[in-house]
Amino acid sequence: MNQFIMLGCLWLGACATAFSQQQTNGVNYQLGPMPSVHKPLAENSVPMGSIQTFEEVKLDLPITSGPYEPTWKSIEANYPGTPEWLRDSKFEIWIHFGPQSAGESGDWYARKMYVEGTPAYENHLKNYGHPSEVGYKEVLRDWNPKKFNPKALVDIYKDAGARFLIIQGVHHDQFDMWDSKYQPWNSTRLGPKRDLIGEWEKAARKAGIRFGLTFHHEYSWWWWQTAFQSDTKGDKKGVPYDGNLTLADGKGKWWEGLDPKYLYGINLREYETVAEAANSRWSPPQAGIFSGHLEYAEWYAKWWALRMMDAVDKYNPDFIYTDGTDQQPFSGSGTGTGYKCDAMQRVIADFYNKTMDRRGKVDVFSIVKFRKQTNGTVNTCETGIPENIKTDQAWIAETPVGDWFYGPNFVYSSDAVIRYLLEIVARDGAVGVSIPLRPDGSLDECWR
């Protein structure tokens, strides 16, 4: 690791001194199969439904029994306050690692490899082939982090002064990094064929360091829309990319039995602004409801929630983290565009009730990214610096030292990263620093 960043880390450390059933406290829940959907209509031809007239759906999804009900009111009333260990922990490592690193194209490789003219698209052509023939599913199959050694990495991070780890559970690519009950596209069945989250958990517990799991799959249903495109010019013009494949198309192929819809989702490009947003640098579609896909939307929200509950069941994390830009996932606007439901409240209530059962107290927290701070949730500040000191709440700032996923020769200067660390800690925040791992699971030499 770069010696200057390591020194900064040490200083901060010193400052700190379906597929099966879910069992929830005696309640069995069987997630049904993905609902069928109509044939896609013409692109950009369907207006989004109104979020003003669409009432938030209360999901029929059981949670672990306990004092926490799946409402913000109950969560805020029962939560005992942010644990002191977060207040005392000013530096942590953000482990933003997964198969997208295999593209060596930085963040969002899985989406950008389907956008003509992007570096990710060109890199994919060179290293794998055309996305109509060799898509992201083949990246998953071939990804082999053979040098991934979580024990050695955790020791490095702890020596650098990290007090807890932020570990990516699933990114927007929908690939679960654990032995997932509900997602067959996972790291125990494809690629490394290892329970990567389980390995991180064991290493963290052995080192006596806390950890949390992050989940970025809520808005994957519109994020993945580039996989339903095709080239607009050249020899492959009009040939659909592999997001258009079906379960039946896999017969006799290596991915037989794996449904591409559980990876890429369904084609939603008929809704206004969805295709445009998919090809933008960042912008989500306009606020609204995917009103022609309400049965699928409800199923999708349950699938999202159950995968998080599954990871909590298996690994007993010290916090959970959901990505997004609005006040909660599935809000109907921002990254939560498409549906409105109480999936987030159910996940948090289940997490806190489970923790109470296991530990006898709730010494954990939930990050709902960019949610206005409320009792029961913690918010974050990605790469920004608040104007004022924020002593009224525990909060976390996060920044990568290069791109979020590995990209060669993309590194911020040491003094810029250290300056960021100091600015955040001076404002009473904690800092999560992402140091991207190489595709093989090793640290780049410049970070050692």
Protein language model annotation of sequence segments:
Residues 21-448:
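Mature catalytic domains of secreted/periplasmic carbohydrate-active enzymes
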Residues 2, 16-19:
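Short intrinsically disordered, low-complexity coil segments enriched in acidic
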Residues 1-4, 157:
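Positively charged n-region of N-terminal signal peptides that target proteins for export
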Residues 6-16:
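Bacterial N-terminal signal peptides
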